[in-house]
Structures are given as structure tokens and as C-alpha cells.
Design a protein with these regions (language model features):
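Surface/interface-facing alpha-helical segments and adjacent flexible terminal/loop regions used
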Residues: 1-59, 69-207
């Protein structure tokens, strides 16, 4: 188990222990016939859980949006070649975490958490811009077009959780066009490899 996984594991274990202790206390209240107090404690525990999950989702969405802004407003195509895939993959990773946390479009979707995230989306976007500005201090290719970044979030939560990264980039005004160019070149290169494989009788899995 690496250090990052160990930290996550320990945090989850502590959270599980805390919730278990609270549930035992609530069960004891019910056994003593203090039903109203038990219900109040259970409601409080649920509200705390929703708040915690909302905060966690907000942090992940902010990171996701930060990476999309980088893809849209980086002024150096060579930087896109170096880091474009990294930024895109991390944006996807953050999104998948959020989708899993809220059970996005599943039968037992976490409606309360989703509503909270929607209410805080503007604040989350502002945090993404702050993250971008911090990254800009170490990566000067993010500085030139920083003023093009919209001050108001143009995405809806549904956009962020459902659309492809390239589509989210292209929704932004005055983006450099470097990332769409990069994606097109990658798709063209992949198609050439697939066509070459067909000619040579090679499986595409071998590419």
C-alpha cells in the first residue's frame, strides 16, 4: 500500500469508526425509548454526512475545472503536448469520483448532495480560478490568456458530469484552440495506426 492509499484508508477507517460510534449511541437512545432524541441525532448525522460529501465533491470539481481552464487557455502548444493528457486524465479522474459519490443518474442518486453542489457551483468555479492562478506562478504558459477566463461559470453541473472534456473546453469563450488541435492530431494518428494495422493484418490491440 503506497502512502497516498494509506492516508485515504486511514481517513476512511476513522470516518467509519466515528459513524459507527454515533449509530451505536442512536441505537441506545432508541432502546431507552428516547425516539424523538434518536431521530434528531440521526437527522443531524445525515446532515453532517451530506455537508462532508458536498465539500469533498466541491474540491474535486474545482480541480476538474482548473484543468479544463488550463487546456483552454494555455498559450504554448508544446506545453499541451507535454501536459495535455495529464490535465485531461486528472479532470476525468476528479469527475468520476464525484459521479461515484453522488451516484450520478443511478436509481439511488444522492439528490441532496447534488442540490448542494448546484447551489455552490459558482463558488466552486471561483476556487478553480484561484487554483489556476496558483498554477500560473510555476507555469508561465498559463499567464498570457488568463484574462480571457470567464468570471462567471458557464457550465452547468450536468455539463461537467456528462460532457466530454473536449466539449467542455470548446464551450469556453476565446480559448486558444490548441487543445482541440491536439485532440484532432491524436485522433488522426490513431486512425492511421488502425488503417495500417488493417493493411498489415495486425490486431488493433497490438498498437
Amino acid at each position: 500500500m503506497d502512502k497516498t492509499t494509506e492516508v485515504i484508508y486511514n481517513e476512511a477507517l476513522l470516518k467509519f469508526k466515528t459513524i459507527s460510534e454515533r449509530l451505536v449511541e442512536i441505537a441506545n437512545l432508541m432502546q431507552r425509548g428516547e425516539i424523538i432524541v434518536a431521530k434528531e441525532e440521526l437527522d443531524r448525522l445525515y446532515i453532517e454526512s451530506v455537508h462532508t460529501e458536498t465539500k469533498k465533491c466541491g474540491s474535486r470539481l474545482a480541480r476538474m475545472m482548473e484543468h479544463i481552464l488550463k487546456l483552454a487557455y494555455c498559450d504554448d502548444y508544446n506545453e499541451i503536448l507535454r501536459n495535455g493528457r495529464i490535465w485531461k486524465n486528472d479532470a476525468i479522474k476528479q469527475r468520476e469520483e464525484v459521479r461515484n459519490l453522488v451516484q450520478w443518474k443511478n436509481k439511488h442518486q444522492e439528490t441532496n448532495i447534488i442540490n448542494n453542489i448546484n447551489d455552490l457551483l459558482s463558488e466552486t468555479y471561483e476556487r478553480a480560478i484561484r487554483y489556476y492562478n496558483i498554477a500560473m506562478k510555476d507555469n508561465h504558459s498559463l499567464a498570457l490568456y488568463e484574462e480571457r477566463i470567464p468570471l462567471i461559470c458557464i457550465w452547468k453541473l450536468e455539463d461537467l458530469l456528462d460532457k466530454e472534456i473536449i466539449d467542455l473546453v470548446e464551450m469556453l469563450p476565446n480559448q486558444t484552440g490548441y487543445y482541440p488541435k491536439y485532440v484532432k492530431e491524436q485522433l488522426d494518428a490513431r486512425e492511421k495506426k488502425l488503417n495500417a494495422a488493417k493493411v498489415l493484418g495486425t490486431s488493433s490491440d497490438d498498437i
